[in-house]
Regions:
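Sec-dependent signal peptide recognition
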Residues: 2-9
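Hydrophobic h-region of N-terminal signal peptides that target proteins for export
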Residues: 9-19
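Low-complexity, glycine/serine/threonine/alanine-rich intrinsically disordered linker
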Residues: 20-46, 59-75, 79-684
Length: 684
């Protein structure tokens, strides 16, 4: 049978009467300009011999959308191929556009624009933290998101499974454990970390270097460290008998001085957990040569975490040696820079009262008494326990569901509580079952709202999760109750207010993690020998630059063209040194003007972008070109055909990356995308 007849039959079979226009207009274009490269005998992801025309099928609909876009933009057929007749092309595109639009509207009318969207891991964590007044990493208990183009809040990619439900319950249990704190009151005062005289740290002063010793030393009034690579093992607070006994805010104060320092050094503070395997730089304070500096840091710590101090931005000895090369003389013979810690103190948890405010707010109206015999606090109901419980659910329900709750909803959760027993099942345990159910319910996990225009409460919720990643605050709730939020002036004022709130940084961080792929910053680790300058301080500065840059554009309402080329950026001393900029001191990130001939400016030349589009050792024109097309231009290229591997083209004789990719582009199925990917990739 003639192939053109086969194609027409395949495209027409099953078409309703209104689809006959498709047969007449689209099939001739496919036969004339497409089928030679897109049939069963070619290595491309599109095969017109198999594609149907049932636009109610989501996969088929997406295929025809891509076909329309590429033909409409002139990307297909390729430039080397014969161009289609303009009348034929325009007629086919007009019919295809009409069919796609009609199918899309029909789907929206039947199913709505999108499926129900649930809270992301980040939104879940922030919402529970803000409702219960807690901290802690709750997201770690939840499964990874099935992201779409790096964004986790795309409804059609989200899902919920038995694994999700179990994970939500685990996370809620962890949140309630922290929120209901009725143990003995933490001891006041603080803890002095005596690194000079502690038995554990002292044994490292004289131990041979081959056994990990002699990389630290003590002077008459200080403990000196020369590198953070091994010293954390020596200076870990848990090795000195201290880990954080309660979750909450703690204050760390210390005094440090640069030892043998000829340049500014950093006094770093890290928090870590053996249980969860995470280590995070939480503070970096610059100390100038010859000066002593007192530092202070208030930070949230989880139960069981520990911390350690570290010297950062330390230059090696004049002869180029680092501390680990001092096999004989050790730390006392080393001439490089170090950090000398004179004293360090920890205070906390910083609670004004005990049980803490978060516990009293949760157990609203329930008296809490001290039982000296058992050295614990206990709930002591003054009315029927279920009446107390009803008060708790009535208080938290509107926050959890981001809307008013009905009496029936309140009773449905109250009824889940086990019977009260003063000793075996007291009030503070009785409340857990209803709250556990509430915070794992569809009303909490999914964004509400009915089809059609949003009501005021749904609008308040959409706004708060857009800019704050959490539930509305009391001002938004009040405007929603009064039905004033839809007023354009009121809405504009609220957006401006919310953008000035520190919580809007959650939006900035989360959006840039997805849009610019900053979440991939740790996907590769630069080779230490090739890039010894890369470390935690540079990494933090690299991440801060695009976030502060984006924040500046929002706060000052600057033009979008700054994303491509700007006359300013944000740096600190460490990042400026990486960029080769002079006369920048201090670890504080600040806006700096760029000269007209600077290679910096805009997003594309920022260090974080260049890192997430490299492989840790070499630059990658393909990754960088793909990033430009997908993130800046919004035209992500198609994935390669499954039958095409990166090494399949003949690259014999190629030497440079440019020559390698030139050989790659000789393959027809690769050329159509790489002709767009490679040019911006090489520019970067």
């Amino acid at each position: 049978m003639n192939r053109s007849i086969v194609i027409i039959l395949l495209l027409v079979i099953g078409l309703p009467a209104h689809g006959q226009a498709f047969k007449a207009a689209v099939s001739p274009l496919v036969e004339a300009s497409c089928i030679d490269c897109h049939d069963a005998d070619t290595d491309t992801p599109l095969n017109f011999e198999k594609i149907g025309h049932d636009l109610s099928d989501a996969a088929t609909f997406r295929k025809w959308v891509k076909i329309f876009d590429r033909v409409d933009k002139g990307e297909m057929p390729p430039k080397k191929k014969k161009r289609p007749d303009s009348v034929l092309k325009n007629s086919a595109l007009a019919v295809l556009k009409a069919d796609l639009s009609a199918a899309n509207l029909k789907e929206q009318a039947a199913q709505g624009r999108v499926v129900a969207r649930r809270l992301t891991r980040l939104e879940f964590e922030y919402t529970l933290q803000d409702i219960l007044g807690i901290g802690g990493n709750l997201a770690r208990h939840l499964p990874p998101e099935n992201a779409s183009a790096k964004f986790a809040n795309v409804a059609e990619k989200q899902g919920i499974s038995p694994v999700h439900v179990r994970s939500y319950l685990t996370a809620v249990d962890a949140a309630l454990d922290e929120a209901i704190a009725l143990g003995p009151k933490p001891r006041g005062g603080g803890r002095d970390m005596d690194y000079r005289n502690n038995r554990y740290s002292s044994m490292w002063f004289d131990r041979p270097m081959r056994n990990g010793g002699q990389t630290v030393m003590r002077t008459d009034d200080a403990y000196v460290m020369f590198s953070y690579r091994r010293e954390p093992f020596v200076a870990r607070s848990d090795h000195m008998g201290y880990h954080f006994p309660y979750p909450g805010l703690y204050r760390i104060t210390a005094e440090g001085v640069g030892y043998q320092a000829k340049t500014p050094i950093g006094f770093g503070l890290y928090k870590a957990s053996d249980k969860h395997g995470n280590t995070e730089l939480i503070g970096n304070f610059e100390i100038k040569p010859g000066e002593s500096r007192k530092i202070e840091l208030t930070q949230y710590f989880e139960l069981g975490e520990f911390f350690f101090p570290a010297g950062l931005s330390l230059d090696a000895a004049p002869d180029g040696k680092i501390i680990y090369m001092m096999r004989v003389k050790g730390a006392r013979g080393y001439q490089g820079e170090g950090l000398a810690i004179k004293w360090l103190k920890i205070e906390g948890p910083l609670e004004e009262e005990w049980p803490p405010t978060r516990t009293r707010n949760l157990l609203t109206g329930v008296p809490i008494i001290w039982l000296p015999k058992h050295r614990i606090y206990w709930t002591h109901p003054t009315k029927a326990p279920k009446e107390h419980l009803r008060d708790v659910v009535k208080q938290l329900g509107p926050k959890a569901f981001r809307r008013p709750v009905t009496d029936a909803e309140i009773e449905s959760f109250v009824s889940l509580a086990k019977p009260h027993h003063p000793k075996e099942h007291p009030m503070h345990k009785m409340v857990r079952s209803p709250l556990r159910a509430m915070f794992s319910s569809p009303q909490f996990l999914f964004h509400g709202g009915q089809p059609g225009p949003l009501d005021d409460h749904s609008l308040a919720s959409r706004l708060s999760y857009f800019l704050w990643k959490t539930l509305p605050d009391e001002q938004l709730f009040a405007l929603a109750r009064d039905k004033k939020l839809k007023d354009p002036k009121v809405l504009a004022n609220q957006v401006n207010r919310m953008l000035k709130d520190p919580r809007s940084n959650r939006f900035v961080d989360d959006f840039l993690d997805g849009w610019l792929h900053l979440s991939d910053i740790d996907a590769t680790t630069p080779d230490e020998k090739l890039y010894p300058e890369y470390g935690d301080t540079l990494r933090q500065a690299m991440l801060a630059e695009p976030r502060l840059f984006f924040r500046e554009l929002i706060d000052r309402n600057l033009a979008a063209r700054n994303f491509i080329k700007s006359d300013f950026t944000f740096v600190n001393r460490r990042l400026a040194r990486h960029y080769g900029m002079a006369n920048i001191s201090g670890e504080r990130m600040r806006r700096v003007a760029l000269p007209a001939d600077s290679v910096r400016g805009g997003l594309m030349t920022q260090a974080s972008i260049l890192k997430v589009t490299a492989n840790g050792t070499l630059t990658s024109p393909v990754k960088r070109g793909h990033w430009v097309l997908a993130s800046l231009l919004g035209t992500p290229p198609q994935p390669p055909p499954p039958t095409i591997s990166a090494l399949e083209p003949d690259i014999r004789g190629a030497v440079t990356i440019r020559e390698t990719l030139a050989k790659h582009r000789d393959v027809a199925s690769c050329a159509s995308c790489h002709q767009h990917i490679d040019p911006p990739g090489f520019a970067l």
